[in-house]
Amino acid sequence: MSFTSRLKKELFIKAQNLVPQHQLSRVVGKVAASENPILKAAVIHAFKTKYGIDLSIAEQGNALKYKSFNDFFTRALKDGVRLVDENPDSIVSPADGAISQIGKITAGEVFQAKGQSFSVEKLIGDPQLAQPFQEGEFATVYLSPRDYHRVHMPFSGTLTETLYVPGELFSVNQVTAENVPGLFARNERMVCLFDTELGRMAVVLVGAMIVAGIETVATGKVKPSGRIELQHHELKLEKGAELGRFYLGSTAIILFEKDKIEWEKRFKAESVVVMGERMGHTI
């Protein structure tokens, strides 16, 4: 790596700590939620142009029909665009995106990037709720700005708890994953815990800088409170059912208990996945 590249990376990481993360995200959130026709049209057009958004696969193909940028960003897809693997033993991708990391949880640590990891206990935010996953399996899926931003069930189960864990709002990308210790266990997140025929399963929706919000089917849009909030539920959700959505995106992490599943060998860091695609199978 050249000196210039290294310097840019170091400055970017330092800036993460200097920027008022939550205040900036709130401002962006207000703009994203605005229904002002001129403002929302301008923002949607700029975003669509920059990221090459393909609206031909969206349920609503006319960008002007969305009531706000948030509405556009969390757009539904046409029926049949994403097919959920129907094999009863399959574990499917919860979202469109790229695999950041995938593999085993070793000694309670989840691999983040070269030289970086974080504890599953810190990720979950509760030692007792984290216990079943200590030596289990994980997959981290990063949703880029151009991706479909709804998160779906990787396997059928009953939602039993949601745990909102307050935190920081670092940007999520390869640079921060490699240079911010415990990135995913430090950022604000919503932990969703399930009972399944395989035992316990978790889907963690991780926020990031300028992410305007996280929403789940059980809690609605999360209102940051600055404190850990645990809620109990009894909600059955089938594989492929919508679980939640990101307003300006980030990362979904799925966790399973030890010796319950195996990941498909073709998947590795940076592999592209789409929602419903088979990522693994039960043992």
Swiss-Prot record:
Keyword Lipid metabolism: yes
Enzyme's top EC category: lyase
Keyword Plastid assigned: no
Record keywords, A-Z: Cell membrane, Decarboxylase, Lipid biosynthesis, Lipid metabolism, Lyase, Membrane, Phospholipid biosynthesis, Phospholipid metabolism, Pyruvate, Zymogen
Oligomeric form and interacting partners: Heterodimer of a large membrane-associated beta subunit and a small pyruvoyl-containing alpha subunit.
Cofactor or coenzyme needed: pyruvate
Function: Catalyzes the formation of phosphatidylethanolamine (PtdEtn) from phosphatidylserine (PtdSer).
Residues modified to Pyruvic acid (Ser): 250
Entry's Gene Ontology molecular function annotations: phosphatidylserine decarboxylase activity
EC code: 4.1.1.65
UniProt membrane topology term: Peripheral membrane protein
PANTHER family assigned to the protein according to its UniProt record, in alphabetical order: PHOSPHATIDYLSERINE DECARBOXYLASE, PHOSPHATIDYLSERINE DECARBOXYLASE PROENZYME, MITOCHONDRIAL
Annotated metabolic or biological route of this protein: Phospholipid metabolism; phosphatidylethanolamine biosynthesis; phosphatidylethanolamine from CDP-diacylglycerol: step 2/2
Record-level GO BP terms: phosphatidylethanolamine biosynthetic process
Catalytic residues identified in the record: 96 (charge relay system), 152 (charge relay system), 250 (charge relay system), 250 (schiff-base intermediate with substrate)
Organism domain of life: Bacteria
Main location: membrane
Protein name: Phosphatidylserine decarboxylase proenzyme
GO CC aspect terms: plasma membrane
Record site feature (Cleavage (non-hydrolytic)), residues: 249-250
Similarity comment text for this entry: Belongs to the phosphatidylserine decarboxylase family. PSD-B subfamily. Prokaryotic type I sub-subfamily.
